[in-house]
Amino acid sequence: MDSWMIKHFSQANPAGTGQDDVPALLRRVADSIERRGSVQVQDLVMHTEITADGPWPSLTVYFHDTED
């Protein structure tokens, strides 16, 4: 059976005005994935925290390097 190490990172928009902008968050995460180079994304999980400024979504990306 093959196995590999799964890695992850979480990302959100800056707190305050625009923190609930999901399209901006998706673009931000896409840019982060591209900067990592050759990776295979396994899963994306969206979370939403409720703050005094309103909803604050974040995404956790689970991935592995394709060179591993």
Predicted regions and their residues:
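N-terminal acidic leader/helix
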Residues: 1-36
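Short, charge-rich amphipathic interface segments used for partner binding and complex assembly
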Residues: 28-68
